[in-house]
Design a protein with these regions (language model features):
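A generic structural motif
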Residues: 75-76, 112
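A sequence-level signature for low-complexity, intrinsically disordered linkers and tails enriched
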Residues: 1-17
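Short proline/glycine- and basic residue-enriched helix-capping loop/turn segments at helix->loop/beta transitions
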Residues: 25-60, 85-120
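A short acidic/small-residue loop/turn micro-motif
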Residues: 76-82
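Second-shell loop/turn segments in exported
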Residues: 21-26, 72-73
Length: 120
């Protein structure tokens, strides 16, 4: 009787790139296209509006090789209501065209500022 022990291999996802030969794109455009999409889907939180809270929320997320967004987190927040709205909107994003390195789709880390500004 011989017992065999199979070595278990855990395949870890490759670390996302920050610089790539071909940047990810949104709807065939650049970051400005994504900014337009974010603002068309954003709802200014009532509590922030009532308290006159505005500012810039900086998010970081990973654009996966399949174009989906993951690991969405706040790098620099303003107020929990604005931070949560920024995460909510970005998490609804349609798929991107992924970044490419050596002609292969790769994961890319992306930092994205969202400006919340009250208008009178």
């Amino acid at each position: 009787y011989v017992a065999e022990v199979a070595e278990e291999t855990i395949e870890e996802a490759p670390i996302p790139y920050t610089l790539v030969e071909e940047k990810p794109s949104f709807n065939g455009g650049d970051a400005n296209e994504f900014t337009k999409w974010v603002f068309s889907n954003m709802v200014y939180p009532e509590v922030a509006r009532e308290n006159g809270i505005s500012g810039r929320v900086t998010l970081q997320f990973t654009i996966e090789a399949d174009g989906s967004l993951t690991n969405i987190k706040v790098l620099r927040g303003v107020d929990p209501s604005l931070d949560q709205e920024a995460i909510r909107v970005v998490s609804m994003s349609p798929k991107w065209t992924p970044g490419r390195q050596r002609d292969k789709a790769v994961r890319v880390t992306y930092n994205f500022p969202i400006y919340f500004q009250l208008r009178n």
